[in-house]
């Protein structure tokens, strides 16, 4: 047992370093190519001339597509090995190291150039890859899946400052590939990754800053659960739209470089309307939580952003769908909050409350992981008083979504990419 705890600690540190390396690479490329040192792609887009804002995502997609296409052509005769941690956990626990690194580099290119795709996909992949490389050298083969799972959970903890949610991400989404009795090392790796991330960042701040002062009574619980019902309907719709977008790109029969470039060009065109479509949506979520926008502004940004997400994901841009899903959920929740605000006092407080509820419930509706989704929002914001209401709403959203569509967004995304 002591040996496993020691290995879990080392994997947590390795995962945090992998996440930090990807984050610093992003910041370096943003500074070199976009003259941006704020860490916000939205700020970078606002500082660019219209024509640069238009073509930058397309150029990033083209570069990433060429990289992926070139690697595929060079390695056509090689036997296939997983380049995704979920696939590795479901097979023999081995990665194609070269292909995984190329996929992560391609993800870095599309993320830095403004595509509306999440960076957490590459971060978790690199963390799991680091764990796999360590495990293959120093642990017996029968433990490899455990350490890949620990690396993936630690990667999520480092990316989202949410170690418990990262651990439950493994337990809920990958249920059946890892026994619950093995979660001890997974939790240790996730917590160590978070602590290492805090040391590297020089602070232990929450991922999102929220000022929520509303008292929770029966009325608030009704609003939270009703948000879960709406999210349970919207989750399958979002996944259907992603599938439809992906199939539309496939029907064009473009080579990967041109397909990703087209997805980037669509993002660039949308960014001429609003630069908030750039990136994974993190900075927009934070600004909305600090100052909820008006009804019409939420709707306008929401439509543009979801079109950008569909273009990026549908074109095959390598990356995650986690943070974009959080943005969509926030927008749905705040939209409902503004509707409730027509009749109830404290419109901004209601918008923030239901925005957080929307983030949790849409995440639950798309991942079919209600406990993880609830803890994720609480850990990212520190608003643990919402836990009982969010848990009920997330279960409602997950059950309704699973009834309407069996696949989760991660199973769908893995199948398409």
Curated annotation (Swiss-Prot):
One of its GO terms (molecular function) is voltage-gated chloride channel activity. The keyword Transmembrane applies. It comes from Salmonella typhimurium (strain LT2 / SGSC1412 / ATCC 700720). GO terms for cellular component: chloride channel complex; plasma membrane. The gene is clcB. Residues 26-53, 167-172, 243-257, 309-315, 372-379 are periplasmic. Probably acts as an electrical shunt for an outwardly-directed proton pump that is linked to amino acid decarboxylation, as part of the extreme acid resistance (XAR) response. Belongs to the chloride channel (TC 2.A.49) family. ClcB subfamily. One of its GO terms (biological process) is response to acidic pH. This is Voltage-gated ClC-type chloride channel ClcB. It is a multi-pass membrane protein. Its main location: membrane. It is found in: Cell inner membrane. Residues 1-4, 75-145, 196-221, 279-287, 337-348, 401-417 are cytoplasmic. CDD domains: Voltage_gated_ClC (cd00400). Gene3D superfamilies: Clc chloride channel. Keywords: Cell inner membrane, Cell membrane, Chloride, Chloride channel, Ion channel, Ion transport, Membrane, Transmembrane, Transmembrane helix, Transport, Voltage-gated channel. NCBIfam families: PRK01610.1. The lineage of its organism: Bacteria, Pseudomonadati, Pseudomonadota, Gammaproteobacteria, Enterobacterales. SUPFAM superfamilies: Clc chloride channel. The chain crosses the membrane at residues 5-25, 54-74, 146-166, 173-195, 222-242, 258-278, 288-308, 316-336, 349-371, 380-400.
